[in-house]
Amino acid sequence: TVRIYGEDVRSYTLDSLRQVIGVVPQKASLVSGTIAENLRWGDAAAGDAELEHACKIAQAWEFVSQTSEGLETKVTQGGRSLSGGQKQRLTIARALVGHPKLLILDDSMSALDYATDLELRRQLAAEMGDVTKIMISQRATSIQHADHILVMDDGKCVGYGTHDELLVQCPVYADIYHTQMQ
């Protein structure tokens, strides 16, 4: 049985599940409008202070605040006027605006540089400690501090444990980690 906060997932309606789960895909999806309008897809009633806070956690506030219009900056369809990393950070911020109990990050930091990735993970830990986070990543540094790591290879689970345990017990994980550290 799959449980969310101790409750059988089947006891939730689809709408109530959508309210407690935030999903951030690898390919960021933005629509034409303003940054604020895109972020409010997470919670239509969110105020500007809440949007700013989510942007700060997601490491998006620095570039948003540097524009002359801030949260009211126009976004083109698909976010073509933004870099891949900026789009990913805004998509993460949008999920945070929704106050998820479960946050799924599906390789959604792949376009970020290592320093931004690290700071984003630090902020998620500091500001959202009570939120369960599932991070899917091909970057070992993005998940090495996770409580639990599940290693998949060719569609099969080949390892499970902490970073230190997997370095010893899982050749696939150890190879990935050592290759990426070179």
Annotate each language-model stretch with its function:
Residues 66, 115, 122, 130, ...:
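C-terminal portion of ABC ATPase nucleotide-binding domains
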Residues 1-16, 118:
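ABC ATPase NBD Q-loop/coupling interface
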Residues 1-3, 18, 36-77, 122, ...:
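ABC ATPase nucleotide-binding domain helical subdomain, centered on the C-loop/LSGGQ "ABC signature"
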